[in-house]
Amino acid sequence: VKDIYFDDTPNDSTNNPRWRTILLGGLGAGGKGLYAIDITDVNNPTHLFAINNDNTNQSIQYWDIDGLKQEFGYASGSMDPKYDYRKLGETWSTPRIIRIKVSGKDKWVAVFGGGYNGAVNPNYGSAVFMMDLEDEGRLLKVIDIEDSANNIVNSIPADLSVITADGTEKATYNGALVYAADLEGKITKINLTDQGTLYQKTTLFNSESTSDNGRYIYKKPEATINNDNKLWLYFGTGNTQKLQEQSSQTQNRVYGIKDKDFPNFV
């Protein structure tokens, strides 16, 4: 939930930006989609948009602010890039609403992990999504997170760690630095600030996970500024989907890693 300033009547002929309170949510294990609701008046909430990735029927379904449904087939040639959510998995990752600079203009966006793929389907889940909240949820950017050379089918079910100036005075930038943890045990740092190259990414840490040692990351890295004035990320590994599983090969760990470049990207 976030207060954002935007034109919530995009289909009329006037530009009418105003402050609105937006609730943006995913379907969790129930599906591969998201929805947005204007809850400025909590007694009269209104639908803004909804998106669903129907990978069974190979189509993207989109409902606009008026409730009108559009459908885009994967292979039909009708896929508009602004609706290309084909890589979206089960939407476990909580969307974070932030303001970043795109092409010189400030823009309200949502950023979230690609979701869960059951650790079996490489076609979706292994990405970070950028959604344009000023354009009815249309896709702004997909940042792919590559698979490592191991036997894990990668995805990003975890919430992202999103560091902005609202959270720490050490963030001497506009926008956000984002840290994404994936099933392969990697931490990827993504630049969504006004400094350096927008959408640039780098692997900050690799726990060398395999299906044998079980070092999956399902949960968000928790961030803090330590007494060295550097940003540290703390997280643990483990398979939250098989809590009763026992194996002598399992080698889960708890990590604390320092981003020595913070508040810069590199």
Protein language model regions, located:
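Beta-propeller fold recognition
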Residues: V1-V266
